[in-house]
């Protein structure tokens, strides 16, 4: 049987590879402490689970859901956005619930790109931006994110011949993997750049509620002109510890939202209705979980930054996101450091090159590690230094 070229050319997904390595080590009876994947270890709040249990018992929720989501859910999403960011959205035309924001990111490439078009993708970045664009038949132009520019793309460095074919601009702040943040000035610049070059902006903002030291991330849609050129993907996964329930949203430009809705309606049958009702409970209920999460992650951030500095790594504490972006010690590449750390200590980190060539020289560490495991990992890092 011959597979399609798009599948044959598809690289292995980074986090699947990491999970396999972890499983192999554990199968040998070796202890593994993984800082590799940003999957919250904290539980979904009880009042949200209670709504799920109640909804699951109602036979009305056992049938096919509406692809575009319950009207009451879209209303809750719009109200949450206005309350959190001051952004007004029409729940009927500017809000689309998703089976996790990753679904919408994957679909967006098919909605806004044709074969031969160019997608402008940050480097380093969440791999799905580039992979989904390539699956849609587009070429990818990588925009380097460098420390010298605060891990923001330099739009002026994009060649004119690339811009003439570019159709989509991917951006993501607070950023994965760098932990960098962006303000309204940058988002306004992005919106103006997109308007000038007729680009569709897709901003991925799932980490807006994970922030530290009093910092409050902003939404791309708060910037003047943003809704005219783009959409924002958001997720309940990180904010409410709901990665396993798979629910997110796309909001913003009505034409782009309609395109996603049309594409989605032909590929899936929507989000299970009980999970939609669960999401309403999350958005409309107590938001205490968000501040509680941030307190836990900030404590872990501080412990891990201290531990990394103690082994000679010049680490900047992130203002937001679930990640620490750490430069590797002199004499190592990203991959060689990650490999040696795993082999000698059982500590798993993600090499920066897994997110793009501009990630060379860095590793990413996640804060979603239970406190006991975190302390074991810190002890192993100290032991690694003593062996070096």
Curated annotation (Swiss-Prot):
Cofactor(s) of this protein: pyridoxal 5'-phosphate
Binding site for pyridoxal 5'-phosphate: 101-102, 126, 176, 207, 235-237, 246
Binding, substrate: 13, 38, 102, 126, 176, 364
Keyword Metal-binding appears in the UniProt entry: no
Matching InterPro entries: Aminotransferase_I/II_large (IPR004839), DAP-NH2Trfase_DapL_Desulfo (IPR019881), DapL/ALD1 (IPR019942), LL-DAP_aminotransferase (IPR050881), NHTrfase_class1_PyrdxlP-BS (IPR004838), PyrdxlP-dep_Trfase (IPR015424), PyrdxlP-dep_Trfase_major (IPR015421), PyrdxlP-dep_Trfase_small (IPR015422)
Catalytic activity: (2S,6S)-2,6-diaminopimelate + 2-oxoglutarate = (S)-2,3,4,5-tetrahydrodipicolinate + L-glutamate + H2O + H(+)
Entry's EC annotation: 2.6.1.83
Pathway the protein takes part in: Amino-acid biosynthesis; L-lysine biosynthesis via DAP pathway; LL-2,6-diaminopimelate from (S)-tetrahydrodipicolinate (aminotransferase route): step 1/1
Pfam families the record matches: Aminotran_1_2 (PF00155)
GO molecular function terms listed in the Swiss-Prot or TrEMBL record: L,L-diaminopimelate aminotransferase activity; pyridoxal phosphate binding
UniProt-listed SUPFAM superfamilies: PLP-dependent transferases (SSF53383)
Keyword Transferase set for record: yes
One GO BP: lysine biosynthetic process via diaminopimelate, diaminopimelate-aminotransferase pathway
CDD domains: AAT_like
Sorted UniProt keywords: Aminotransferase, Pyridoxal phosphate, Transferase
N6-(pyridoxal phosphate)lysine: residues bearing it: 238
Function: Involved in the synthesis of meso-diaminopimelate (m-DAP or DL-DAP), required for both lysine and peptidoglycan biosynthesis. Catalyzes the direct conversion of tetrahydrodipicolinate to LL-diaminopimelate.
Subunit structure: Homodimer.
Family recorded in the similarity comment: Belongs to the class-I pyridoxal-phosphate-dependent aminotransferase family. LL-diaminopimelate aminotransferase subfamily.
UniProt protein name: LL-diaminopimelate aminotransferase
Source species of the chain: Dehalococcoides mccartyi (strain ATCC BAA-2266 / KCTC 15142 / 195) (Dehalococcoides ethenogenes (strain 195))
Species lineage: Bacteria, Bacillati, Chloroflexota, Dehalococcoidia, Dehalococcoidales
């Amino acid at each position: 049987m011959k597979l399609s070229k798009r599948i044959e050319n598809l690289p292995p997904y980074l986090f699947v590879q990491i999970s396999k390595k972890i499983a192999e080590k554990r199968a040998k009876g070796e202890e593994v402490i993984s800082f590799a994947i940003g999957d919250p270890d904290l539980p979904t709040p009880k009042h949200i689970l209670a709504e799920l249990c109640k909804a699951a018992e109602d036979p009305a929720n056992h049938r096919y859901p509406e692809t575009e989501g319950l009207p009451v859910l879209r209303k809750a999403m719009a109200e949450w956005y206005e309350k959190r960011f001051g952004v007004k959205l029409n729940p009927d035309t500017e809000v689309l619930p998703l089976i996790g924001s990753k679904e919408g990111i994957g679909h967006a490439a098919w909605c806004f790109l044709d074969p031969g078009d160019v997608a402008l993708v940050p480097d380093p970045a969440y791999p799905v931006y580039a992979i989904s664009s390539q699956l849609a038949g587009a070429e990818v132009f990588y925009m380097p994110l460098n420390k010298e520019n605060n891990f923001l793309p330099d739009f002026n460095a994009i060649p004119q011949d690339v811009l003439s074919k570019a159709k989509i601009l991917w951006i993501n702040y607070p950023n994965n993997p760098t932990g960098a943040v962006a303000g309204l000035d940058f988002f306004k610049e992005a919106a103006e750049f997109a308007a000038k070059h007729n680009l569709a902006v897709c901003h991925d903002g799932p980490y807006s509620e994970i922030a530290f030291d009093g910092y409050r991330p902003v939404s791309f849609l708060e910037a003047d002109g943003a809704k005219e050129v783009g959409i924002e993907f958001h997720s309940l996964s990180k904010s409410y510890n709901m990665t396993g329930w798979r629910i997110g949203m796309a909001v913003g430009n009505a034409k782009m939202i309609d395109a996603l809705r049309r594409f989605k309606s032909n590929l899936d049958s929507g989000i299970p209705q009980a999970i939609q009702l669960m999401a309403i409970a999350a958005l409309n209920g107590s938001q205490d979980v968000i501040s509680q999460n941030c307190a836990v992650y900030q404590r872990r951030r501080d412990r891990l930054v201290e531990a990394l500095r103690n082994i000679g790594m010049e680490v900047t504490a992130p203002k937001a996101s679930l990640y620490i972006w750490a430069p590797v010690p002199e004499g190592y590449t990203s991959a060689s450091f990650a490999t040696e750390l795993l082999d000698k200590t059982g500590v798993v980190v993600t090499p920066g090159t897994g997110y793009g060539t501009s990630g060379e020289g860095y590793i990413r560490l996640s804060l979603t590690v239970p406190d006991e495991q975190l302390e074991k990992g810190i002890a192993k890092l100290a032991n690694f230094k003593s062996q070096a």
